Amino acid sequence: MTSSQEWTQEWTQGNQPGLTVRWSLREAPEGTEKALADYVAGTSHARFTGKPGLRFKTWRMREGEWFEGCYVFATDAERAEFQESFTATAAESAGSQIIGSSPVLIEPCTVVAVAEGGEGFAAAASYTT
């Protein structure tokens, strides 16, 4: 193993395994963004709250552009297991059904760090009023 490979292996062992799942909203029907927000608030948030092996999940969206789930897992094995099972059924997932298409990206990543700001984390099923 080269010194670069050794450094990379050592470095990634101390970081958190993540996964990004992204759908395009460019051709999604009108009302899709609201339907996604309602689904997250009414179903998906509860499904992932307290999920074993998951550190946290965020749902992000740019109206008319994309919707994504960002997951951070406790171990790479848990990330790999979730990625494998999700990928196998991605086309039938709730997000795909609401949007009308499969994800355009299912990508593992490494979360280097997370900083909690002075206002603290505000975990919520919805940030809309």
Per-segment meaning from a language model:
Residues 1-66, 77-84, 101-129:
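Short S/T/G/P-rich N-terminal loop/turn motif that feeds into the first structured element of a domain
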